[in-house]
């Protein structure tokens, strides 16, 4: 184990010099430094660059407070390795695989895997066309998720990405019954804490591994924690042959952390100040999130859109890797429609008659056509009013508004805030409900009866209570 000394500390970036003749650590190797020589105060560094003359530049996985020039640094000879396998289920840990749930740490002999790996080869990949039912009407109807696919939840600040991801965990993890891995990347610690206790109460935690590198942690931890979660998911897929659900909240913070350290590593900033290696870093992460012939990884990723600008390089780079996109729209939150999923901007390659069936496809495309026509008519309505529309257009507008409200739904995870019980709607019920609205069977019911309900029977029941 070769050793060097700290030459310079600039925030999360630490330069380490090794004596001439000593073997230099490889890129991505983990180095260990003890604060003040205290074996309990260990800081892990990861080699990012080799500068020449025995000098390497590293990124710290923990705060560099207390580090001084001249402290001894040891090369472990391998990349950061984290615990994998059944021992990780029901546990919460950090980027280094250290437990943070106040329970006993992992045993020394626990199976460990390095967080840096190559993506599976082409001939190992599997192509599945099986739909993953979420129980959320707007998603199942218009932008269905594929089992073993990659899903992005796009939205600006405060439009409901985390609530939607928590509802998906509630619905899919309980229905799916398989193994889930939740990775919190640079998000609020409070949300992670709430999610942990919620999962503990529902019993889902027994089949879930949780990894966190939250907002208050150094960029090194936020940059690598997604790889830690992915490594655990890969083990369950490749070694145990399981179908795994991988939740990542939030992929943008992974990019943001890379951007924070990029300039300190001496790289020239690229578009909008992002790192020049943005596409490469995103590709290395996303290409590993895939399904092989041994098992599948279905990933659901929340992606923050800065200032609601979808042309920003961070969300734009993520777009290219996804099978389905669920776009959350601020205007819908202002109308009180939750989940605020934009039915026209959201898309999925699974929405084809070969995968979802002829009836589902026909209903979904007709719903989109009606909503698109309504959007076109809104300018006329705003300027001239409803009276200037033809009878046919008035009928279409009425149905479009009912469809728009019927796309909203109460969530189980939001019950404590709304006081209304959540609902899980099977795909067949969803398709039937929208088909009946399109056929005009419920034109006589008030629009408000369609707001925040489950299946179409709930609408009829709600309308009766309103006196219709």
Curated annotation (Swiss-Prot):
<keyword id="KW-0139">CF(1)</keyword>
<keyword id="KW-0813">Transport</keyword>
<dbReference type="InterPro" id="IPR036121">
    <property type="entry name" value="ATPase_F1/V1/A1_a/bsu_N_sf"/>
</dbReference>
<dbReference type="Pfam" id="PF22919">
    <property type="entry name" value="ATP-synt_VA_C"/>
</dbReference>
<keyword id="KW-0067">ATP-binding</keyword>
<protein>
    <recommendedName>
        <fullName>ATP synthase subunit beta</fullName>
        <ecNumber>7.1.2.2</ecNumber>
    </recommendedName>
</protein>
<dbReference type="GO" id="GO:0046933">
    <property type="term" value="F:proton-transporting ATP synthase activity, rotational mechanism"/>
</dbReference>
<keyword id="KW-0472">Membrane</keyword>
<comment type="function">
    <text>Produces ATP from ADP in the presence of a proton gradient across the membrane. The catalytic sites are hosted primarily by the beta subunits.</text>
</comment>
<feature type="binding site">
    <location>
        <begin position="155"/>
        <end position="162"/>
    </location>
    <ligand>
        <name>ATP</name>
    </ligand>
</feature>
<dbReference type="InterPro" id="IPR050053">
    <property type="entry name" value="ATPase_alpha/beta_chains"/>
</dbReference>
<dbReference type="InterPro" id="IPR003593">
    <property type="entry name" value="AAA+_ATPase"/>
</dbReference>
<keyword id="KW-1278">Translocase</keyword>
<dbReference type="GO" id="GO:0005886">
    <property type="term" value="C:plasma membrane"/>
</dbReference>
<dbReference type="InterPro" id="IPR027417">
    <property type="entry name" value="P-loop_NTPase"/>
</dbReference>
<keyword id="KW-0066">ATP synthesis</keyword>
<keyword id="KW-0406">Ion transport</keyword>
<dbReference type="InterPro" id="IPR055190">
    <property type="entry name" value="ATP-synt_VA_C"/>
</dbReference>
<dbReference type="InterPro" id="IPR005722">
    <property type="entry name" value="ATP_synth_F1_bsu"/>
</dbReference>
<keyword id="KW-1003">Cell membrane</keyword>
<dbReference type="GO" id="GO:0016887">
    <property type="term" value="F:ATP hydrolysis activity"/>
</dbReference>
<dbReference type="InterPro" id="IPR024034">
    <property type="entry name" value="ATPase_F1/V1_b/a_C"/>
</dbReference>
<keyword id="KW-0375">Hydrogen ion transport</keyword>
<dbReference type="InterPro" id="IPR000194">
    <property type="entry name" value="ATPase_F1/V1/A1_a/bsu_nucl-bd"/>
</dbReference>
<dbReference type="GO" id="GO:0005524">
    <property type="term" value="F:ATP binding"/>
</dbReference>
<dbReference type="Pfam" id="PF00006">
    <property type="entry name" value="ATP-synt_ab"/>
</dbReference>
<dbReference type="InterPro" id="IPR020003">
    <property type="entry name" value="ATPase_a/bsu_AS"/>
</dbReference>
<dbReference type="GO" id="GO:0045259">
    <property type="term" value="C:proton-transporting ATP synthase complex"/>
</dbReference>
<dbReference type="InterPro" id="IPR004100">
    <property type="entry name" value="ATPase_F1/V1/A1_a/bsu_N"/>
</dbReference>
<comment type="subunit">
    <text>F-type ATPases have 2 components, CF(1) - the catalytic core - and CF(0) - the membrane proton channel. CF(1) has five subunits: alpha(3), beta(3), gamma(1), delta(1), epsilon(1). CF(0) has three main subunits: a(1), b(2) and c(9-12). The alpha and beta chains form an alternating ring which encloses part of the gamma chain. CF(1) is attached to CF(0) by a central stalk formed by the gamma and epsilon chains, while a peripheral stalk is formed by the delta and b chains.</text>
</comment>
<comment type="similarity">
    <text>Belongs to the ATPase alpha/beta chains family.</text>
</comment>
<keyword id="KW-0547">Nucleotide-binding</keyword>
<dbReference type="Pfam" id="PF02874">
    <property type="entry name" value="ATP-synt_ab_N"/>
</dbReference>
